[in-house]
């Protein structure tokens, strides 16, 4: 062994090596942090090159990937990132990375170092900007995260001899190889997240499809689910078709029971977001605190009981439609928070500081008079103008009489399918239903059909079996009575129910009786009784005769409830006569 070989490194050399090692560790630490926080690791490569330049004097970084990844693909790389080079995005990779170098790394799968590109490959094989005699190059392979034996790309960096350091050392090769390894791990992690997300979305789509198939027509999601051909409903459908393709917020207005969610789903189904999620929130069903957590989500530990992170409805509806039902019921304090999301498309989870951006279309619905609420200071004017970009007024059922029969048939078919029955409506039953006003709109019509089908004695429902023919239709009485002198089911009604939304609809007319009752003969005034015990058999019979043997009418004459009349009939063993 010579003296030169046995001679230990000088303190100055050891100090220089220690500084270089520390700089390399600092660079790797910064790069690892950048990749860990990056949603797209490839997009952070220019920043990585800046770190390498600052800490290790590695200039002119290049990341090139295969244009056609695969085992049999040729070497035809395209540049993803290149720093310190003035080049257009369409320029070939050979402008910043010699083809010969790319072929060597892609085919061998090992790092490549050149201390003089021109001397090694010839001037014609090296881009003009890289022909300086002092230009050196290091290139390491970037492997496919799923197939480690397959080279996906090349990570390269240049250094000029005219800098303080010349050429490359083994340490430089190791550092750049570790950077490539960090990039591979980040790509593998992001691919795994993307696969898991796609799998979760596919599971969600599959479950939604299963639920939709099980519900059948109960949850229509397109214009095909809207039943009716009346001019009023045709105008609404035309408006939905016109506005669905835009990004504008839609405000559905109308009385309770007019089917706002059905029309909101129709807007979603006709829009470019049809394949995205449709998320519904009933704003009236939640308190202000719960509504904030439900819409925005919350971080783990944000409040007592928040044992895990929960995404809000805005996040779940990203790329789709969020249906805010009963938006007129939210508190003034929460309106300002909602306004910010609608204006800027961003929010923070409850208990969190990270701002989340979403792309969600808003469809809101209300049966309140929002203009009056704004005038009274109960609803923010700026929020009103934000949600009321495209208002669509849904007509009440009494304004679309021709749609009642097909709707009733739809509900009857649904009842038969759900209960394995074959109940049908007689023609006079359909006629009777079509004469009703239905202040509860489509929801009340559905209840009416289901009640009649469930209580029917036979396979055909007759007109006299309907509640309105028996004087037991509460909603019909609510519309007929003008004062509160007559109790209905024990409740005094003070006024006629009117729509809460201002629409150009004529006042409802009382449903005419199918058969005019014979004029009652003069009789003595029946004294009011409030207790069944005070009622005599004769008084009850006299009231029934005057009322044409209709229990509800007899109850009103006696100032009693139908239940009390039924109890009195049982007590006195009186059978109702059919007239």
Swiss-Prot record:
Residues 505-518 are annotated as: 7 X 2 AA tandem repeats of X-P. ATP binds at residues 254-261, 317-326. CDD domains: AAA (cd00009). InterPro entries: AAA+_ATPase, GAF, GAF-like_dom_sf, Homeodomain-like_sf, HTH_Fis, Nif-specific_regulatory_prot, P-loop_NTPase, Sigma_54_int. A divalent metal cation binds at residues 468, 473. One of its GO terms (biological process) is phosphorelay signal transduction system. Residues 551-570 bind DNA. One of its GO terms (molecular function) is ATP hydrolysis activity. Residues 505-520 have a biased composition (Pro residues). Residues 40-187 form the GAF domain. Residues 226-454 form the Sigma-54 factor interaction domain. Residues 502-529 are annotated as: Disordered. PROSITE patterns: SIGMA54_INTERACT_1, SIGMA54_INTERACT_2, SIGMA54_INTERACT_3, SIGMA54_INTERACT_4. Keywords: Activator, ATP-binding, DNA-binding, Metal-binding, Nitrogen fixation, Nucleotide-binding, Repeat, Transcription, Transcription regulation, Two-component regulatory system. Residues 537-579 are annotated as: C-terminal DNA-binding domain. Sequence repeats lie at residues 505-506, 507-508, 509-510, 511-512, 513-514, 515-516, 517-518. Residues 464-536 are annotated as: Inter-domain linker. Required for activation of most nif operons, which are directly involved in nitrogen fixation. Interacts with sigma-54. This is Nif-specific regulatory protein. The lineage of its organism: Bacteria, Pseudomonadati, Pseudomonadota, Alphaproteobacteria, Rhodobacterales. The gene is nifA1.
């Amino acid at each position: 062994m010579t003296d030169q070989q046995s001679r230990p490194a000088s303190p100055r050399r050891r100090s220089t090596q220690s500084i270089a090692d520390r700089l390399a560790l600092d660079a790797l630490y910064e790069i690892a942090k950048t990749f860990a926080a990056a949603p797209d690791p490839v997009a952070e490569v220019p920043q990585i090159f800046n770190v390498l330049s600052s800490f290790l004097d590695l200039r002119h970084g290049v990341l090139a990937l295969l244009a056609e990844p695969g085992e049999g693909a040729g070497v035809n790389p395209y540049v993803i990132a290149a720093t310190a080079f003035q080049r257009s995005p369409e320029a070939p990779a050979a402008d910043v990375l010699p083809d010969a170098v790319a072929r060597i790394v892609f085919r061998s799968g090992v790092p490549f170092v050149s201390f003089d590109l021109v001397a090694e490959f010839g001037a014609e094989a090296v881009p003009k900007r890289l022909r300086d005699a002092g230009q050196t190059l290091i290139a390491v392979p970037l492997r496919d995260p799923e197939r480690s034996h397959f080279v996906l790309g090349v990570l390269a960096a240049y250094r000029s001899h005219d800098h303080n350091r010349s050429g490359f050392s083994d340490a430089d090769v190791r550092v750049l190889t570790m950077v490539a390894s960090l990039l591979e791990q980040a790509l593998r992690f992001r691919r795994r997240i993307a696969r898991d997300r796609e799998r979760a979305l596919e599971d969600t789509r599959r479950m939604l499809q299963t639920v939709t198939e099980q519900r059948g027509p109960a949850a229509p999601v397109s214009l095909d689910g809207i039943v009716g051909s009346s001019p009023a409903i045709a105008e609404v459908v035309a408006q939905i078709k016109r506005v669905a393709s835009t990004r504008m917020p839609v405000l559905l207005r109308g009385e309770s029971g007019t089917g706002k969610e059905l029309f909101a789903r129709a807007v979603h189904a006709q829009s470019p977001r049809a394949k995205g999620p449709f998320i519904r929130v009933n704003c009236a069903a939640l308190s202000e605190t719960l509504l904030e957590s439900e819409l925005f989500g919350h971080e783990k530990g944000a409040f007592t009981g928040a044992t895990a992170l929960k995404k809000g409805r805005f996040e779940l509806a990203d790329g789709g439609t969020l249906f805010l039902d009963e938006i007129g019921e939210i508190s003034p304090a929460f309106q300002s928070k909602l306004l910010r999301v609608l204006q800027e498309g961003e929010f923070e989870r409850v208990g969190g500081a990270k701002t989340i951006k979403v792309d969600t279309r808003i469809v809101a619905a209300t049966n309140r008079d929002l203009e009056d609420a704004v005038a009274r200071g109960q609803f923010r004017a700026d929020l009103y103008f934000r949600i009321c970009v495209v208002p669509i007024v849904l007509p009440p059922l009494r304004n679309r009489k021709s749609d009642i029969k097909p709707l009733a048939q739809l509900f009857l078919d649904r009842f038969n399918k759900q209960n394995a029955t074959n109940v049908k409506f007689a023609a006079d039953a359909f006629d009777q239903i079509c004469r009703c006003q239905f202040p509860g709109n489509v929801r009340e019509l559905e209840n009416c059909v289901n009640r009649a089908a469930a209580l029917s004695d036979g396979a055909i429902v007759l007109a006299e079996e309907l509640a309105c023919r028996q004087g037991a239709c509460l909603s019909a009485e609510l519309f007929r009575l003008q004062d509160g002198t007559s109790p209905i089911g024990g409740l005094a009604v003070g006024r006629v129910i009117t729509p809460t939304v201002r629409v150009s609809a004529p006042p409802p007319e009382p449903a005419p009786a199918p058969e005019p009752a014979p004029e009652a003969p003069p009789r003595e005034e029946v004294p009011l009784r409030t207790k069944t015990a005070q009622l005599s058999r004769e008084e009850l019979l006299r009231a029934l005769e005057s009322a044409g043997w209709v229990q509800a009418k007899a109850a009103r004459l006696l100032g009693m409830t139908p239940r009390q009349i039924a109890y009195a009939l049982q007590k006195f063993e009186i059978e109702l006569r059919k007239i």
